[in-house]
Amino acid sequence: MANFSEPPPGGFGSLDMPWMIIPDWFEWKRVHNQGVAFGLGNGTSWAPIVFLVVPIIALFIIRYFWKKGAFEHVYSKLAVSLLLCGIFGNLTDRLAQGFLLEYAKNDSFWERLSQGYVVDFISVRLPFYDKIVPSSHGWWPTFNVADSCICIAAVLLFLGGLKEEQAKKMKNSD
């Protein structure tokens, strides 16, 4: 049994102890990720700080546009809700993993901040992905629920923007 109160011996990569839910298709797999969705920026020295600051800035930007009435369509409102869930989920995880773990209690503020990471755990195998990234053996990069919320929000924001544009064109043609 793994002791998840200590950092993994190899750093913040995969703990490589999958729990197969649907064989060869879906598994739970604990992965420590200092980067963002799908491991982008993971293992870099700048990622923990940048990916702590960027979501905070994003929250202020979302608030600004919300007050300006930028999210009129139901798709856009749902997207903002999902985006906030994703931001707060990953932000909470990153702060908790950097500051609340027992092994970091004697570290300085900046050392703790630089140790922050999110826990990704959803791993799925896609039939075509090994053709794109042969080294993946078909396994999509491990992600978490917050990453899913952010990705779905991006699609909904795009669709909401299209719907709002269509509504404006119809209103102007009347």
Regions found by a protein language model. Name each.
Residues 1-174:
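Alpha-helical transmembrane bundles and membrane-interface segments of multipass inner-membrane proteins
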